[in-house]
Structures are given as structure tokens and as C-alpha cells.
A protein has these predicted regions:
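Nucleotide-sugar donor-binding/catalytic module of glycosyltransferases
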Residues: 1-209
Length: 209
């Protein structure tokens, strides 16, 4: 199975290297990994660093630099559109992947669900755990929800603690690429910074249509 890390970025060259290192250091999995970076016209040397990273890391890195800043929404969509994997893991360029995440997700992805929502650990810029983190996305532990089942759908949204539970936080989201591609995007959501949420909710809506 192939996973595309779809990374929108703007002037975060000092963070991207740590993210790529965290992906490279994953072990005990057999997933095929690619990295797709959509650059919103960064001016901090991101483009110049790409070839260095390509030589250093053990996965292909695909890079697209826009000639001008196209805004966050279009950059999110651009990053996912670059992916060729079975699943796209939409990842913020200032976050990192925790140890054994790919081994854990390989087991979960075998179920073939359309969308996976991961929680997060909150660290400061020195990678120290924040003492008073925000609430978890959902009440309760890990479980599978079937959104084609009305009772499951209601239960899921009743368990949401924050907007992160509504698929807003980039690095938490893994989506089946063909389901994403099937959605016809509504351009009126450009400028909201939640274009990706629209697509994910449309995927859920399509399960019930």
C-alpha cells in the first residue's frame, strides 16, 4: 500500500527537514511512502533545499513551487493533487511524525476506511511537551465509525470536543485518494482556510446519498 505525505508549506524550511527526518526514521512497516510538497512561493530557501533532501532521504520527494502565493486553501488542494498513493496523509509543514506511526497506521489502513482521524501531541518549538494541552479531538478511545449509519454519524459528532474533530487539523487527516478525487470542489470555500474540510465532509455526505 502506498501513502502520500501531502505537505503544503510557506517559509518553513527550518521545520520541513525535521518532518522529513521523522518520516525517514519510521520502522517496522512495509508501506510505500512518497512526499509531495506544495510550496506557496516561499522566500526562505525551501526550493534550494529540495535537492539536498532528495539525496538524503529514502523516499521520493516531489516538489511544486507556485510562482505566487495562492493562499492556504489552494495550496492544501495542490498538495493533495500531487499525491499518487492509495491514501494521502495531509501534513502541516511545522509538525513531525511520532515514532512507529506508520507501523500503527499500516494495520489501521488495512481496514480500507475512507477517512482516518489521528489525534496529536502538543509540543513547543523546543520539542518540550506542553503542560496544558488542548482537549482531545474526541471523547473516548480509538474506534471505527460507519458514517453511512445514521446512529454512528450522530454518535461521532456528539463525541467531538473541538473543531479538530471536524477534520480541520491538517496533520490529523488521512484520506483515501480516490474518494477525495471524486468530490467536485465548490470554489466558494476558497478563502476560508477550510477547503479540505469541505471535501472531507462531502465524502461523508456521499456515503449517505
Amino acid at each position: 500500500m502506498k501513502v502520500s505525505f501531502c505537505i503544503p508549506t510557506y517559509n518553513r524550511v527550518k521545520f520541513i527537514e525535521d518532518l522529513l527526518e521523522s518520516i525517514n526514521n519510521q520502522s517496522s512497516h512495509s508501506l510505500i511512502v512518497e512526499v509531495c510538497i506544495s510550496d506557496n512561493a516561499s522566500t526562505d530557501g525551501t526550493e534550494e533545499s529540495i535537492n539536498i533532501w532528495r539525496d538524503r532521504f529514502n523516499f521520493p520527494i516531489f516538489y511544486q513551487r507556485h510562482n505566487e502565493n495562492i493562499g492556504p486553501d489552494r495550496n492544501y488542494l495542490s498538495a493533495v493533487n500531487m499525491g499518487t498513493g492509495d491514501y494521502c496523509w495531509i501534513f502541516g509543514s511545522d509538525d513531525i511524525l511520532t515514532k512507529n506511526s506508520l507501523a500503527l497506521m499500516e494495520d489501521k489502513l488495512a481496514a480500507g476506511s475512507d477517512i482516518y482521524l489521528c489525534d496529536r501531541r502538543e509540543l513547543d518549538i523546543s520539542m518540550t511537551k506542553i503542560s496544558n494541552p488542548h482537549r482531545r479531538w474526541l471523547n473516548g478511545g480509538s474506534r471505527l465509525f460507519s458514517f453511512s449509519n445514521e446512529a454512528d454519524l450522530i454518535e461521532y459528532f456528539s463525541k467531538c470536543n473541538s473543531v479538530g474533530g471536524l477534520f480541520s487539523y491538517l496533520s490529523s487527516i488521512i484520506v483515501k485518494r480516490n474518494k477525495w478525487s471524486d468530490v467536485i470542489f465548490d470554489e466558494s470555500y476558497i478563502g476560508t482556510a477550510y477547503a479540505h474540510v469541505y471535501i472531507l465532509l462531502r465524502i461523508i455526505n456521499n456515503m449517505n446519498s
